[in-house]
Amino acid sequence: MRNRQMLIFIIVVLLVAWPIYQLVDLYLAKKSEKDSNILLYQVSLFQIELLNNLIYDSMNASNTEQLNVLKQFAYTSDYSHQHLVLAYGDSKLTNMNSFLDIMQYIIRLQLGGDRLLKPEEVAVIQELNKAFTEIIEVYENLLSEDGKIISSQNDKLMQLDEVVSEYLRKILLE
């Protein structure tokens, strides 16, 4: 009789404890996902800050070969931002086409091999520097303290990205 009561008690405890354990596990899993999204955002921000610094440094470039590092960081910035878009969803975070447009512009400059940059090509890099200074300011404030995308900042980011993309595409079509 005592064994039977003990068995019933254990079953009741398991029936109560198991759902509580599942709820705690679910909460911790969501927290872990949120933390990983914040870390991914920090990586993406770091990549874009590096890209911005390289754009600034590239204003002093004298030939097309010196733009290789800028091209590589445009790619890594695009790569990290695309993964951030995948993590948050493209309905919450905009894709940034300007990274690929920067790559295309540099590739176009380098098609003729290593040559001196023309003054108008350096002027394009100077315009990119101005634009990316604004993009960095917006990107730094893209996430709220709890790790969610701030839609007003995302809208600003989308507008700035469109301006840069349209500018580069216009130049690429010349």
Regions found by a protein language model. Name each.
Residues 1-7, 172-174:
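Short, Lys/Arg-enriched, disordered terminal segments
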Residues 4-23:
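Hydrophobic membrane-insertion alpha-helices, especially the h-region
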Residues 17-39:
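Transmembrane signal-anchor/signal-peptide helices with a preference for the extracytoplasmic
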Residues 34-51:
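Short extracytoplasmic/periplasmic juxtamembrane "stem" segments immediately C-terminal to an N-terminal membrane anchor
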Residues 54-115, 143-167, 173:
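Alpha-helical segments in soluble extracytoplasmic regions
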Residues 103-133:
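Surface-exposed, polar helix/loop patches in the mature regions of secreted/periplasmic/lumenal proteins
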Residues 131-148:
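Extracytosolic low-complexity repeat regions of secreted or lipid-anchored proteins
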